């Protein structure tokens, strides 16, 4: 299948909400080992986000039911739920491993612009973070370490190549701060990172470009919402 056909089919699959097929089409595009256009990059991101998002939502629901049944002492149900949760976890792991391989083999080595380097390293951080959400023991530690490393690599490039108001730089700060809060259990670090990103963007609001105004201000609002939430639950830490 040619590059253009794969992109067209990915768009078609998106319209049809057939995200697994959208992923397969975008993997064809990614394997060409050339820098993707902004549109192609976004298609790839949307495809994986939908495929992983549905399962992350399922995992949260099932985990919550498991905890309720456990507290009631319903052992036979807990056994069934546990097996079902593990089935979802193996699907999550497969998707994460899949995109992480695509990133390491094709997308990161082919990235030329600072913007795409930040985008892909951030994505790498995100999918290792998703693994860390459900992994335990050494696997959790490995995923958390890899996530931290990827977010740090993305931040390094973002600080030199992207304006503080750039939506990709802001999105990175948002996700990196969530990683500190949820995975590393470091609310002080999470608040510091989110506040710094928000304040830096506010200070340079005049650099906000017309086309990214909506995206940037939305992410700034999300950073602010998280800060409000974290400050109310951890007043002494934030």
From Swiss-Prot:
<comment type="similarity">
    <text>Belongs to the 14-3-3 family.</text>
</comment>
<dbReference type="InterPro" id="IPR036815">
    <property type="entry name" value="14-3-3_dom_sf"/>
</dbReference>
<dbReference type="InterPro" id="IPR023410">
    <property type="entry name" value="14-3-3_domain"/>
</dbReference>
<dbReference type="InterPro" id="IPR000308">
    <property type="entry name" value="14-3-3"/>
</dbReference>
<dbReference type="Pfam" id="PF00244">
    <property type="entry name" value="14-3-3"/>
</dbReference>
<comment type="function">
    <text>14-3-3 family protein that plays a role in the morphological differentiation and secondary metabolism biosynthesis. Required for normal fungal morphogenesis in an environment-dependent manner, affecting the balance between production of conidiophores and the formation of sclerotia, resistant structures that are necessary for the dissemination and survival. Acts as a positive regulator of conidiation and a negative regulator of sclerotial production.</text>
</comment>
<dbReference type="InterPro" id="IPR023409">
    <property type="entry name" value="14-3-3_CS"/>
</dbReference>
<protein>
    <recommendedName>
        <fullName>14-3-3 family protein artA</fullName>
    </recommendedName>
</protein>
């Amino acid at each position: 299948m040619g590059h253009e056909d794969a992109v067209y089919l990915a768009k078609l699959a998106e319209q049809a909400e057939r995200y697994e097929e959208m992923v397969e089409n975008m993997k064809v595009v990614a394997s060409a080992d050339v820098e993707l256009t902004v549109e192609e990059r976004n298609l790839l991101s949307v495809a994986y986000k939908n495929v992983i998002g549905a399962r992350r939502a399922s995992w949260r629901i099932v985990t919550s039911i498991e905890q309720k049944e456990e507290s009631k002492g319903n052992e036979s149900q807990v056994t069934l739920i546990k097996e079902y949760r593990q089935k979802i976890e193996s699907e999550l792991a497969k998707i994460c491993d899949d995109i992480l391989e695509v990133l390491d083999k094709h997308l990161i080595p082919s990235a030329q612009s600072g913007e795409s380097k930040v985008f892909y390293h951030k994505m790498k951080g995100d999918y290792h973070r998703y693994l860390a959400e459900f992994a335990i023991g050494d696997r959790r530690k490995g995923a958390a370490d890899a996530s931290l490393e990827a977010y740090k690599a993305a931040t390094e490039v973002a600080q030199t190549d992207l304006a503080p108001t750039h939506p990709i730089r802001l999105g990175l700060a948002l996700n990196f701060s969530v990683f500190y809060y949820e995975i590393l259990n470091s609310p002080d670090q999470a608040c510091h990172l989110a506040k710094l990103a928000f304040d830096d963007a506010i200070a340079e609001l005049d650099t906000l470009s017309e086309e990214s105004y909506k995206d940037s201000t939305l992410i700034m609002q999300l950073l602010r919402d998280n800060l409000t939430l974290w400050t109310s639950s951890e007043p002494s830490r934030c």
